Swiss-Prot record:
Alphabetical keyword list: Chaperone, Cytoplasm, Disulfide bond, Redox-active center, Zinc
Gene this chain is encoded by: hslO
Species name: Prochlorococcus marinus (strain MIT 9312)
PTM note: Under oxidizing conditions two disulfide bonds are formed involving the reactive cysteines. Under reducing conditions zinc is bound to the reactive cysteines and the protein is inactive.
Location, primary (coarse class): cytoplasm
Pfam family, one: HSP33
Any one GO MF annotation of this record: protein folding chaperone
Domain of life, per lineage: Bacteria
Protein name per its UniProtKB record: 33 kDa chaperonin
Amino acid sequence: MKDRIVRATAANGGIRLVAVLTTESSLEAKKRHGLSYITTCILGRAFSASLLLASSMKIMHGRVTLRVRSDGPLKGLLVDAGRDGKVRGYVGNPDLELDLVKINNNKYSFDFTKALGTGYLNVIRDSGIGEPFTSTVELVNGNIAEDLASYLYHSEQTPSAVFIGEKIQNKNVICSGGLLAQVLPKKDTDPLLVSLLEERCKEINSFSEDLFHSQDNLLSLIRNIFPDIDDKSISEKARSQEVGFKCKCSKQRSLNAMKMLDKCELEDILKKDGRAELVCEFCKNKYLINYEEIRLMIES
């Protein structure tokens, strides 16, 4: 099943519901960055969170940047996601390994709190019009879902519920994704809607299991919470959209970055190596800038 985002509304348009699957994106990041099991899960969660946030932007070129700065051994992370469904990102310590912790009923989980430590979640929304909007909140516990819910509560004052998780079998991530349920701004003072959202979300006992069983049909995942969604509130074209790991780096962007160096630095590169190799932090693609290209920069 390809990664996908699905949108719906409930309560006569008063509640917005978005579900996203990020399994393939997480595995692509694992391959490109050489991620461990825990860092694959953490980056997958950040992919889900950023795509859920970007899904509400009104223009297709709008983007959301999600950055975690913290004192944990993960050494932070950075994710860039667009309303167009493209997402990319990296973590500070891709090789991180931590022991599993027991949660309940002999079930074990990764210690996301220990991995991220204490710190801040920074969210930048860029609509491409005017200055980007930036907001920062303290990390709640590092599991990404509650950290995102805290951001929505403090920065957007929007009653929201966020569920993000993954399913792991035989040390492989077999599904990753998330779900966002929000009372829309014009309805957020309606106590009945807020209560309805709270009651429905209390019925979710294991989001990761629900995601695993509904990954081929995200609309059924949404219906697990709100069986009575507004079927005709969103057009079929707008309801479902493919998402995936996609980087916007290129050879030209690498050349432009090199041009920012002064001529002395460029001369030094030619003397020492005769060429330059630039590596994209987001996707690990490598771009070779040869002698002639660097010489042209110096002479121009």
